[in-house]
Amino acid sequence: MKNFMDEKFMLSTKVAEDLYNDFAKDMPIIDYHCHISPQEICENKSFKNITEVWLYGDHYKWRLMRSSGVDEKYITGDSSDYEKFLAYVKAIETAIGNPLYHWSHLELQRYFGVYEVISEKNAPVIWEKANKVLNDGLTVREIIKKSNVKAICTTDDPIDSLEYHLKLKEDTSFNVKVLPAFRPDKALGINKDGYTDWVSKLAKVSKKNINSYDMFLEALNDRIEFFHSVGGRVSDHALDYVPYLEASKEEVNTIFAKALKGEKVSFEEETKFRTFTMKFLGKKYASLGWAMELHMNAKRDNNTRMYNKLGPDTGFDSVNDNGVAGPLSRFLDSLEKEGSLPKTIIYSLNPNDNFVIGTLLGCFQGTEAFGKIQFGAAWWFNDHRDGMVEQMETLANLGAFSTFIGMLTDSRSFLSYTRHEYFRRILCDLIGKWVENGEVPNDMELLGRITKNICFNNANNYFEMGL
């Protein structure tokens, strides 16, 4: 029997141990997609207690607590921080098999030196030890440095001032790149509440009178240029469905004018608007050498009552099953045939799409980057051992495994960098099993190089970080 979460955790062969310890463990981190706050990095936020850094804003943990029968007052309500901490400890104690069980232990081990098993019995000791470390100076920047993070790409609205990115760019005391990522979901949300208000804000920040679709595109173009000047090299799109329906610019201009008047547009009109706008954005990204991330098949805000109470991103999303093969293929092809397909990273929350993505990759590759079209890392509800292995095995079966740009946190928590360790252990174990089974040669120079590339080097080159 193996020890619980020791140095051999998830490493089932000697090759896996050697790959992890000699090649993966000490590689730096590029967290190229996350939702952490650049303001909190800039201001070097400190935390009063473990609850603030461990549970605040972490809807993964909130969701588990609800699934364990915890009352909402101990999750997002007005209970004390210790009561919330204890409620989570009780929930996670019985959540064996859930990746949160491993992540939570890794977070306590790596940042607080707490190796006690998370349990109600150990809760007072964990609370005391973790809080002492926080009080001794474990700030946001210290967490980032301790994690060996070299670059972070946040998720930012086109109208964002990027004030804190600019300040961090000039801050010579902090040697980590904090770069914006362009997230134009609100620009595409023509049927969403508050759309005209958002367009007004875009007009203000871009200093343009947006009274036509052409002016709207000009404003988006200017914001992309601004993001680029601050160091942005990646965009991100959360697609509740993959839009593809051709339309002329005149037709889209009419649709946009209709929306500006506050009129409801049909689903067909929305799809035409999104298709045309996405193609415009894709061409712009390609011209600047950006990468475009496409996150598909999330069904968001399923619980109306809780959405009205807490808002989005609070733990009430699920996997969707919209068909992606047809529209995704047509969208990529529409850009490729004009020579304007940017580097693209494709994620689906639905693992049934894995072979769709895995086979589409090979249809649109190019020489602009090593692995120009990427099968994105296992995402969100797939962010566990089985999901990661399935994603990597699919990529290996259908494409070029060694071109993979590896892991990201996609997180709102600064403690989530341990997910990179989790991924690296699983990566090394997978390769180790291939060696054990005689499926790949026991060539540590080759395997070590592939491992280091997937952990860091591929992403460094793909995003042109220069690290």
Curated annotation (Swiss-Prot):
Annotated SUPFAM superfamilies: Metallo-dependent hydrolases
Reaction catalyzed: D-glucuronate = D-fructuronate; aldehydo-D-galacturonate = keto-D-tagaturonate
One Pfam family hit: UxaC
Pathway per the UniProt entry: Carbohydrate metabolism; pentose and glucuronate interconversion
EC nos: 5.3.1.12
InterPro entries, sorted: Metal_Hydrolase, Uronate_isomerase
Protein keywords: Isomerase
Any GO MF annotation of the entry: glucuronate isomerase activity
EC category: isomerase
One GO term (biological process): D-glucuronate catabolic process
NCBIfam families: PRK02925.1
Alphabetized PANTHER family for the sequence: URONATE ISOMERASE
Family: Belongs to the metallo-dependent hydrolases superfamily. Uronate isomerase family.
Protein name as annotated: Uronate isomerase
Organism: Clostridium acetobutylicum (strain ATCC 824 / DSM 792 / JCM 1419 / IAM 19013 / LMG 5710 / NBRC 13948 / NRRL B-527 / VKM B-1787 / 2291 / W)
